[in-house]
Amino acid sequence: MLSDGIKCVGVVVKPNHEEARQTACELSEWLEKRGIALIGKPHEEAEICEIEEAGTEEFKEKADLIVVLGGDGTMISTARLTGSREILVLGINYGSLGYLTEFRIEEMFAALEEILAGNYETDRRVMLEVEHWRGNEKLASGRVLNDVVINKAVLARIIEIKVELNNQFVNDFRADGLIVATPTGSTAYSLSAGGPIVYPSMNAIILTPICPFTLTNRPIVIPDNAEINLRLKNESDGVVLTLDGQIGYQMQVGDCVRIRKSPTTFNLVQPPNRNYFDVLRNKLKWGR
């Protein structure tokens, strides 16, 4: 089990949130009594209650469990910290949405006791690996939990994106942009752009055009073992590639974005007696 031999816990705290910072102090004391170390990133969580500092690489290597005190944005940034390791993640909701941070603060210590005892369920979320190429030069790479987005600046004209799956031509999308989303990301930007809600455990990826020029260019659901190539076909100022809405890169005509399923998953502790549709009904206010 992922919880076997937890000796070190990493903490990620929502920036500038005093209540979350105070909870991190309480967590530090709770773990210390049980002989478990707590680490945080330098100049961030490590400034709270003298929590031990750990650089990004050290954080990835040492943490056996990550506790996230924040909202979905904090959780998404945490996904980049797990690297290629199968690290267990416990999300405590201090944000406004909480699709991913499903535990309430009053449930945290009871959840930790269950994790240490090995009594928990894991929700394994698909992640995508992304590469940005210009000719034969790889400009950037990363991993996303929610989505990869190519879109235009406010005043830029419509962009044209060539889409290939496993080197087979699919379509030239003429639109304000294109979203490539995981099932986790299906309730984020893709949903706002008219994409479907996809159950988190489905082996699928969603391609959702943003304000397509042709109304018949609809969202497409594809198997997650497909390799996706996106190529910007026309000149347009201000076209940006965005990873999980948090990291952005400028694109030029001819640039290619390669996307494939990551071999590692993002492993969330699942609350007992609570399911995905409970979350959807609450967050999307179904029936109200």
Where are these regions (language model features)?
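Gly/Ser-rich helix-loop-strand patches that form or flank binding pockets
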Residues: 77, 82-92, 99
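Gly/Ser/Thr-rich active-site loops/lids in small-molecule metabolic enzymes
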Residues: 171-216
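Catalytic core of DAGKc-family lipid kinases
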Residues: 97-176
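ATP/nucleoside-binding phosphotransfer catalytic cores, i.e., glycine-rich phosphate-binding loops
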Residues: 150, 166-169, 215-288
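ATP/NTP phosphate-donor binding region
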Residues: 1-65, 106-121, 132-142, 272
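Short, well-ordered beta-strand core segments
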Residues: 66, 89, 178-179
